[in-house]
Every structure is written in C-alpha cells, then in structure tokens.
Amino acid sequence: MRLDKYLKVSRLIKRRTVANEACGAGKITVNDKVARASYDVKVGDVIEITLGSKSVKVKVTEVKEVVRKEDAATMYEAAV
C-alpha cells in the first residue's frame, strides 16, 4: 500500500492530500530515510511524522486497504 494511503487509512493523517504534501516536503521518514508518497509500506516499517513542533514515531503492525475508524489504531504501535 502507498505511504500516503496508509497514513490516511490508519488515521495518522486525516487526509491523503495532506499526507502527500507532507511526503513531498520531506516531513515523513520511513526507516530513517525520507520517503515519497509512493513508497510501498510493509509490516515492520518505522514511520516518523514531523508536522510543526510535533513528532510521532510508529511501527507498522498490519496493512489493510479498508479499516473501521475504531480499529485504525491497531495498524500501528508506538515506536521508541
């Protein structure tokens, strides 16, 4: 699944266009490398999102095309 779509489906970022723009601006890294929106997300990837002064780092636990809002948080876990 594309990185921008994963971020939207997992509700880490609310809109896919915002995720796409953040990738283009270099604000999202996967496994410590700046990632493009077209990056293919895999289980085990560590995604770091830096927007403004906030930074979030998560580890991908599952990749699903469709997820209910209540279950979105099961797609990742906090990474240290």
Language model region names:
Residues 46:
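Glycine-rich, charged/polar anion/phosphate-binding loops
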Residues 53-80:
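C-terminal structural segments of small proteins and small subunits
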Residues 1-43:
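A basic, amphipathic helix-loop patch mediating RNA/tRNA/ribosome contacts
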